[in-house]
Amino acid sequence: MAFWIYVVPPLAGLVIGYFTNDIAIKMLFRPYRPYRVFGWRIPFTPGLIPQNQPRLAKQIAKTIMGSLLTPEELHNLARKLLQTERMQAGIRWLLGVALDRLQNPEQQQQTAQVLARILADLFNESLPRLVKVLARQETFLEGPINQLFDQVLLELRLSSEQAKQLSEWILKQALPPKVLRQNLVDFLTDRNIESLDEEFRERATGSYWVVANLFGLKNALLRLRTYCLEEPEGAEAILEDLLKDINASRRLTEILQNLSLQNLPVSAVRQLRRALRDGIQDYLRSQGPEVIKGLGETIDWEKVASLVLGRLRNSKALITSIDQISADLALVLERYLERDLESLMMQVIPVLNLDQVIADKVNATSPADLEQAIQQIVRQELQAIVNLGGLLGFLVGCVQVLFLLG
């Protein structure tokens, strides 16, 4: 009998202390659901944790967000995730996927349609609005227009062949004998004839004064106008012979060939440049958006997109430049994130709603799974506590033996 007094209390304390953690955890979770007798819920059913799982989930989420996933920690985590090397690798991967898509004939048509819609939207919608806004500025396109005038128009000079072709077009299409006759008739109005006759009488000197005051120009000009009206074919033949006699084609060719803005005075050139610039700016302000939109509607954007994709697909420079492009884009993103990452994280954290995500995840986990997870943590990571419980139970049993012996 004395032997059991020495052995039973320490062994009982050892067993109780060792298995107390498992029993306590089970008591926290068991039973998983409430039990009722005659409609009356039996106390302590369900267990403490299943009964208060929603409140516990909110407390866990609050603790994690307040102590572990603080804005500073999330900011540091984002910095680690968005290192330049990782961003460069991600951008390189995206570019590689895009190139693979370009190389795939099955997806080329779909890609071309998407690109065509993008190009059409940029040209038909975005570009007209941009031109409308920029055209309000006084210096809009001032530099390019001045450069165009100085480097193209100011240096423009017709070659001999071009001048010859232009002179022939003027004499045959723009100002043929028929047009010259009609212009001459339109010019010789009664009022103009009177004015010419008076000017001739006033300005004539010497023998011409005698002719001007005795005969005048009025009768001759009236006869010329009448002849042009009554004998159009004869008048046109005379005008054609006159143009040949004075060698109008050669003279006009020489004039056109020697025609250059450089021969004008500097003040006249500046005035022309200013007038050209103002004219283009006024036209773009009033008609630019409509002209661009109308031009965009006449373009086959899907064909343009196919040509662009074809050039990109066969571009060796693009393929060999992927690493450099990804590195440059990564550096641009890095500079942007260095400046705005903190403000971005402050905007992202409320959107992520991490505390609610954690609470929902805890609520969605069954009590049995929660119990199993905690038991696994205790067995793997907190075994020393279990052993300590057994040791304390053994020591308590020994103390009881001492009390019994005393």
Swiss-Prot record:
Q: Which keywords has UniProt assigned to this entry?
A: Cell inner membrane, Cell membrane, Membrane, Transmembrane, Transmembrane helix
Regarding the membrane, this protein is recorded as: Multi-pass membrane protein
Indicate where this protein resides in the cell. Cell inner membrane
Q: Give the transmembrane region(s).
A: 1-21, 385-405
| InterPro entries from the UniProt entry | DUF445, UCP032178
Task: Provide a GO CC annotation, any one.
Answer: plasma membrane
Answer yes or no on keyword Acetylation.
no
A Pfam entry, by short name: DUF445
Task: Report the family membership.
Answer: Belongs to the UPF0754 family.
What is the protein name for this chain? UPF0754 membrane protein CYB_2931
